[in-house]
């Protein structure tokens, strides 16, 4: 029979396994693109069986969606840290912009081509980009209040420029 406390141990290791799979998949997808990476390779890179992988994630698209969500969560945590440690809005914008460019350069161009073939994951990514655009506009407005930017700066235009840059990079 099952010993006491065995079940709880199993469920925490399950959560850890899920995290490990997502981390490995993020790394593999961003480095190589999505299409070229198989569930077999993800399992092999973790030293787990394919069956174990499929028990946690039924298919590649579900795993990809979780990867996107994980990246967004990491992004939110990063931005929060930047806000807490920056002396003004301009510094926040520069540090975040630099970080997004670094992240972009660390990502294989194929990733951005491949993700369009996964509608739900692609939508998640686009929603997040729209959200960070709104955040950017709010930051510029805050910057005007702090007297860092002139108030005749057109936020929407600046924001579109920043976004177009990222869109150009991603396409």
Positions of predicted regions on the chain:
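Amphipathic, non-transmembrane alpha-helical scaffold segments
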Residues: 14, 18, 64, 68, ...
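Hydrophobic alpha-helical connector segments
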Residues: 66, 77-106, 159-162
């Amino acid at each position: 029979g099952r010993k006491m406390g065995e079940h709880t141990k199993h469920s925490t290791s399950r959560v850890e396994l899920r995290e490990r799979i997502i981390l490995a998949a993020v790394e593999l997808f961003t480095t190589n693109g999505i299409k070229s990476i198989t569930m077999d390779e993800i399992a092999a890179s973790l030293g787990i069986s394919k069956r174990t992988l499929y028990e946690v994630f039924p298919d590649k698209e579900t795993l990809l969606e979780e990867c996107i969500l994980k990246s967004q969560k990491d992004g939110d945590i990063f931005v929060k840290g930047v806000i807490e440690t920056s002396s003004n809005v301009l510094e926040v914008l520069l540090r975040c912009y630099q970080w997004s460019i670094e992240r972009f350069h660390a990502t294989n161009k194929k990733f951005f081509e491949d993700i369009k073939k996964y509608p739900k994951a692609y939508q998640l990514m686009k929603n997040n980009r729209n959200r960070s655009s709104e955040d950017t506009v709010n930051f510029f407005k805050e910057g005007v209040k702090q007297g860092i930017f002139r108030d005749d700066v057109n936020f929407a235009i600046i924001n579109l420029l920043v976004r177009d840059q990222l869109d150009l990079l991603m396409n």
